[in-house]
């Protein structure tokens, strides 16, 4: 929920076209309850963790904050923020996700999903705007499909059913600039509806297989062509 705001932090991360169309057609949109199963599980997990956090005197749970950006009111609700020894705060966000969201690459390196890094750094900006000093950001990932067998077989697969991952903390300037740009894009979409870009559509470059003349099969492998639909070989 965005509360009394024009957009929430998670709303700003949505494609501007999607958000604008949702605003226009909000009264007629429907959703199959069966598609909300994982969301329900996630809410239950959040509820249990929040109740546990309420027992920690140095933690604040479900804090909703507001700030003004470009004439809009922006809100964000953190799962948990924890006070550090030097009077700073660490933001922790719970994610109930598939294990492959945090599977390491072939080099054994964990690549943090961009949308999570963006989300938490916008939370950090909100906290700073409300007088908090932010010292760190963390994702608490709870894997809904974790497999002990897969963890033994693949060292790049998450080795535990739940893990905590540090998130890169941006500078105050970078976090502010990012939020301002997202607000601008969403405001522009209200008067001139943009198309979603490739990243927002999860699109990948087209690939075309090379096929020898008089052959009904493609050669092993493929190649990317930009601006050309066919490749002829002689």
Task: Describe the role of every protein-language-model region.
Residues 114, 118-121, 174:
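A general alpha-helical scaffold signature found inside nucleotide-binding enzyme cores
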Residues 1-91, 98-117, 128, 149-156:
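Metal-dependent nuclease catalytic cores that hydrolyze phosphodiester bonds in DNA/RNA
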Residues 70, 125-234:
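Metal-dependent nuclease catalytic regions and adjoining charged, substrate-binding loops involved
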């Amino acid at each position: 929920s965005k509360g009394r705001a024009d957009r929430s932090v998670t709303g700003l991360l949505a494609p501007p076209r999607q958000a604008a169309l949702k605003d226009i057609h909000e009264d007629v949109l429907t959703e199959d309850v069966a598609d909300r199963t994982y969301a329900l599980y996630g809410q239950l997990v959040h509820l249990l963790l929040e109740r546990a956090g309420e027992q920690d005197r140095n933690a604040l749970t479900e804090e909703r904050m507001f700030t003004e950006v470009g004439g809009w009111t922006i809100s964000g609700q953190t799962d948990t923020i924890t006070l550090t020894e030097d009077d700073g705060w660490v933001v922790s966000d719970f994610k109930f996700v598939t294990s492959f969201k945090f599977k390491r690459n072939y080099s054994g390196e964990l690549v943090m999903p961009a949308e999570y890094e963006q989300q938490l750094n916008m939370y950090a900006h909100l906290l700073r705007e409300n007088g908090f000093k932010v010292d760190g950001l963390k994702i608490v990932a709870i894997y809904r499909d974790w497999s002990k067998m897969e963890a033994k077989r693949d060292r790049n697969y998450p080795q535990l059913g739940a893990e905590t991952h540090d998130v890169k903390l941006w500078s105050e300037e970078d976090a502010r600039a990012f939020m301002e740009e997202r607000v601008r894009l969403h405001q522009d979409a209200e008067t001139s509806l943009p198309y979603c870009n490739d990243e927002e559509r999860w699109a990948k470059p087209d690939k075309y297989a090379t096929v020898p003349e008089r052959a009904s099969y493609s050669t092993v492998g493929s190649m990317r062509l930009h601006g050309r639909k066919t490749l002829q070989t002689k």
